[in-house]
């Protein structure tokens, strides 16, 4: 058990580090192609999640649980080798004047007391709490309603896969579209998410169609909220150092909020699996994410 906790903590730190700094890397090395390269790295991230959701069970059945751990160890090792190979070529891509920009960014008001930055934190936390709560507890909720285990697997895979086209299209749309276009995207996610949250009040069914629609609608809303806020880290900041500050602040606070979701939902689920308390929480989280998205669109720069 101790080694499992230590290993999980190390994995979490590695993921958190990359999540925070990838938006600033994109801003630093590809300032004129933020949309394209945000699409590239987020697509690969979500594709990896979907792929491993599919292959984990077959590999464990075929070769044992330890074989999956080997695969998981080799994957970051390959990423490290590629990164070490590319490192000597990266420093030439950042212009020297950015050293002065760093001093300016660090001397600005602290990001944690910047009211505009809190919109990013709340939006990131809202979509994260939705995502982690859904993935942790929806299989149990569907099983409670007598949905077959095979069907549950397909529905959860659909939840993951719906985000892939969003990762390809949304960042470039956010770069190209003006304020009205961005507001439309946020509004579409909000409306879709509220419809999905409203459906949970009528969840007493084992219908595959019902739960598939629920999964796709909520997957679209969460995926769009996530891609929106990650892309806006770069768009709404003037340099990579400020991007790193904003990304770190929003994700640190956001993931802290997200950690509360599965625990509190589990407590409510234990009291009443079909209770309205958890359904109202979904509505509140969607509403908060939508409102914060509108505020972010109207924010010029941080």
Model region roles, listed by residue range:
Residues 84-109:
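Flexible cytoplasmic inter-helical loops of multi-pass small-molecule transporters
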């Amino acid at each position: 058990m101790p080694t499992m906790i230590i290993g999980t903590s190390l994995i979490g730190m590695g993921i958190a580090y990359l999540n925070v700094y990838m938006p600033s890397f994109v801003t630093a090395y590809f300032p004129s192609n933020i949309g394209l390269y945000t699409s590239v790295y987020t697509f690969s991230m979500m594709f990896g999640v979907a792929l491993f959701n599919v292959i984990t069970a077959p590999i464990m059945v075929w070769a044992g649980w330890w074989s999956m751990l080997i695969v998981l160890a080799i994957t970051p090792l390959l990423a490290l080798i590629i990164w070490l190979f590319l490192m000597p070529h990266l420093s030439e891509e950042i212009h020297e004047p950015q050293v002065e920009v760093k001093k300016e960014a660090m001397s600005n008001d602290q990001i944690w007391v910047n009211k505009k930055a809190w919109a990013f934190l709340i939006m990131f936390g809202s979509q994260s709490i939705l995502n982690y709560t859904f993935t942790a507890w929806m299989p149990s909720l569907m099983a409670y309603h007598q949905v077959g285990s095979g069907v549950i697997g397909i529905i959860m895979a659909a939840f993951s896969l719906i985000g892939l086209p969003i990762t390809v299209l949304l960042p470039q749309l956010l770069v190209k579209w003006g304020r009205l276009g961005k507001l439309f995207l946020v509004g579409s996610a909000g409306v879709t998410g509220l419809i999905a949250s409203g459906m949970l009040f009528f969840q007493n069914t084992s219908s595959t169609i019902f739960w598939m629609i629920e999964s796709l609608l909520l997957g679209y809303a969460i995926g769009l909220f996530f891609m929106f806020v990650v892309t806006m880290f770069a768009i709404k900041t003037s340099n990579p150092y400020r991007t790193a500050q904003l990304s770190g602040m929003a994700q640190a606070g956001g993931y802290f909020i997200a950690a509360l979701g599965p625990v509190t939902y589990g407590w409510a689920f234990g009291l009443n699996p079909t209770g309205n308390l958890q359904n109202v929480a979904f509505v509140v989280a969607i509403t908060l994410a939508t409102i914060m998205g509108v505020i972010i669109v109207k924010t010029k720069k941080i």
